């Protein structure tokens, strides 16, 4: 039986900044640029009380909380702290799959310190993170990645949730389907139309029926309903593509997606820089409200030189794909491919 830990730092970017400005800890703070089309990179917990959240356009955020405090992001600082945290992980296992600067899966089926349980490993990691960085982390411990990720969010912030193998079916019985990765507003609406509210409800539905309604994702839903996730924790390796996508709570017209394009482009470019890689290809992806997928890509003889160039290529791809302005979209994504090491001698890891 595998033992998986999902570590998720609590409001990471905001928490790093608030270490240096403790007088702001009780105030609504967001990490964002002052660009007119900027979106929130992170929101402190007091800011979340107002409904502020990551990826929210700043215009909307200011309406919800006129007195919010904006701090410009400092990714060099966040990478440095991430590296500290990654060093802690490596003291316990070498099987680490970073998802972002503040989130990772760890396979501790066998841990390096011979601690008696995965729970003990998670407790020690969280304690070390606090002692060395003054930041809190939430952790989920479970037999697979799907459950570990859900568990890490269960007692946030600064929480620990453990799902033991014999507790899996009881845990997922009343688990709302909206908690499942990949279940956005549209999928949730379709599930509700079928009178399906929890994973327990899904357990009574045949796999073929779910596939009929949800395509390939129906098979994944069926497995999740049985508490099954065969995915392994993937230790870092050279990636063939770096991409990010987001599913909207409500379908948007194309012109309403502009701030999200900028946010995704910045995240993808930042990930490229973190990996010390360069890219010669750009791709985009959109899914409309009818689940029709549009994709377009373009490659070049030389590597992209800047974030601005990346954004310019994205704008060109959007023009070439000839989308209808009266259509609405539920998902957008951007990516970089044809990756190779950059000219820099030093190879940085994501953490």
UniProtKB/Swiss-Prot annotation:
The active site is at 103. GO terms for biological process: DNA-templated DNA replication; error-prone translesion synthesis; SOS response. Its main location: cytoplasm. Binds 2 magnesium ions per subunit. Residues 4-184 form the UmuC domain. GO terms for cellular component: cytosol. Mg(2+) binds at residues 8, 102. It catalyses: DNA(n) + a 2'-deoxyribonucleoside 5'-triphosphate = DNA(n+1) + diphosphate. Pfam families: IMS, IMS_C, IMS_HHH_1. It comes from the Bacteria. Keywords: Cytoplasm, DNA damage, DNA repair, DNA replication, DNA-binding, DNA-directed DNA polymerase, Magnesium, Metal-binding, Mutator protein, Nucleotidyltransferase, Transferase. The record marks 13 as: Substrate discrimination. SUPFAM superfamilies: DNA/RNA polymerases (SSF56672), Lesion bypass DNA polymerase (Y-family), little finger domain (SSF100879). Poorly processive, error-prone DNA polymerase involved in untargeted mutagenesis. Copies undamaged DNA at stalled replication forks, which arise in vivo from mismatched or misaligned primer ends. These misaligned primers can be extended by PolIV. Exhibits no 3'-5' exonuclease (proofreading) activity. May be involved in translesional synthesis, in conjunction with the beta clamp from PolIII. PANTHER family: DNA POLYMERASE KAPPA, DNA REPAIR POLYMERASE UMUC / TRANSFERASE FAMILY MEMBER. Belongs to the DNA polymerase type-Y family. Monomer. This is DNA polymerase IV. It comes from Acinetobacter baylyi (strain ATCC 33305 / BD413 / ADP1). The gene is dinB.
């Amino acid at each position: 039986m595998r033992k998986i830990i999902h570590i998720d730092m609590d409001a990471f970017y905001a928490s790093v900044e608030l270490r240096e400005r403790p007088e702001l800890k009780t105030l609504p703070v967001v990490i964002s640029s002052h660009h007119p089309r900027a979106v929130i990179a992170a929101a402190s917990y007091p800011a979340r009380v107002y409904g502020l959240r990551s990826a929210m356009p700043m215009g909307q955020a200011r309406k919800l909380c006129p007195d919010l405090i904006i701090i410009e992001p400092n990714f060099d600082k966040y990478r440095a702290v991430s590296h500290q945290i990654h060093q802690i992980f490596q003291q316990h296992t070498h099987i680490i799959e970073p998802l972002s600067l503040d989130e990772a899966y760890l396979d501790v089926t066998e841990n390096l310190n011979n601690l008696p349980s995965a729970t003990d490993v998670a407790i020690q990691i969280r304690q070390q993170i606090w002692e060395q960085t003054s930041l809190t982390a939430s952790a989920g411990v479970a037999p697979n990645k799907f459950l570990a990720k859900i568990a890490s969010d269960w007692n946030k912030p600064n929480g620990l949730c453990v799902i033991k193998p014999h507790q899996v079916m009881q845990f997922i019985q009343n688990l709302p389907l909206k908690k499942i990765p990949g279940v956005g507003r549209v999928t949730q609406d379709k599930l509700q139309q079928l009178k399906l509210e929890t994973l327990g409800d899904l357990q009574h539905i045949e796999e073929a029926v779910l596939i009929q309604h949800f395509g390939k994702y129906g098979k994944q839903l069926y497995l999740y309903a049985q508490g099954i996730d065969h995915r392994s924790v993937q230790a870092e390796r050279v990636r063939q593509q770096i991409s990010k996508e987001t599913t909207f709570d409500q379908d948007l017209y194309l012109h309403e997606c502009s701030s999200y394009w900028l946010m995704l482009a910045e995240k993808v470019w930042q990930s490229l820089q973190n990996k010390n890689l360069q890219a010669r290809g750009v791709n985009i992806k959109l899914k409309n409200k009818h689940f029709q997928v549009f994709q377009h890509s373009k490659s070049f003889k030389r590597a992209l030189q800047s974030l601005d160039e990346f954004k310019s290529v994205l704008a060109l791809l959007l023009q070439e794909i000839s989308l209808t302005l009266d259509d609405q979209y539920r998902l957008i994504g951007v990516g970089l491919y044809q990756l190779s090491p950059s000219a820099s001698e030093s190879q940085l890891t994501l953490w």
